[in-house]
């Protein structure tokens, strides 16, 4: 992509799976809210940290008719995943995983946790690819000394793939910014929010 500004929507449509890196959860919620507000296709919002659900339930964020809020708890995640895969393999949809950190937390204790989560994300990506659906994965993260994205609190490596679009969200004062990243995590271009 050239060094000009591009829209977030154009960046999200480059690949099926989009990694959304952030350090501030309110910036993430603002970004997700903005991106899904104009979405006409079915939306599956997997809310592991329940922040977005709280905003919807309190009326801060409008509840949309095409929005399916899922809170995987009490062992429901695998059933929820099966249902989402069945639906997105038939109809173009938007899938939001909020967040990868919460994904790790809910499955903590499972054997080979990293591989299991990578498999779930790739399974969703494969199903979404057939219908040109879009997946956004929020990741509370930072770059480590080697220039690789790691989960903010645990230091676990973040799933990486050259076919993922990477967007970094930042906040300065009261303004949110989005930057499209290259596969090596260097800055590509600023995105218009």
Residues covered by each model-derived region:
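Conserved P-loop
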Residues: 12-84
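Conserved nucleotide-binding/hydrolysis micro-motifs of P-loop NTPases
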Residues: 50-52, 73-76, 101-102, 141-145, ...
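Short, surface-exposed amphipathic charged segments that create phosphate/polyanion-binding patches used
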Residues: 81-88, 181-184
């Amino acid at each position: 992509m050239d060094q000009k500004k591009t829209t977030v929507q154009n960046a999200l449509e480059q690949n099926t799976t989009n990694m959304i890196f952030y350090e501030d959860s309110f910036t993430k919620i603002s970004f997700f809210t903005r991106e899904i507000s104009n979405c006409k296709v079915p939306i599956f919002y997997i809310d592991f940290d329940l922040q977005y659900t709280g905003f919807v339930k309190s009326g801060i964020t409008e509840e949309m008719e095409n929005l399916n809020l899922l809170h995987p708890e009490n062992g429901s995640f695998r059933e929820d995943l099966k249902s989402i895969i069945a639906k997105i393999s038939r109809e173009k949809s938007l899938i939001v995983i909020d967040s990868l950190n919460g994904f790790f937390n809910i499955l903590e204790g499972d054997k080979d946790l990293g591989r299991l989560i990578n498999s779930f994300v790739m399974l969703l990506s494969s199903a979404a690819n057939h219908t040109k659906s879009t997946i956004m994965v929020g990741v509370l993260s930072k770059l480590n000394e080697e220039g690789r994205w790691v989960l903010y609190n645990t230091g676990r490596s973040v799933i990486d793939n050259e076919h993922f679009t990477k967007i970094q969200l930042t906040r300065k004062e009261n303004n949110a910014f989005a930057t499209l990243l290259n596969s090596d995590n260097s800055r590509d271009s600023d995105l218009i929010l």
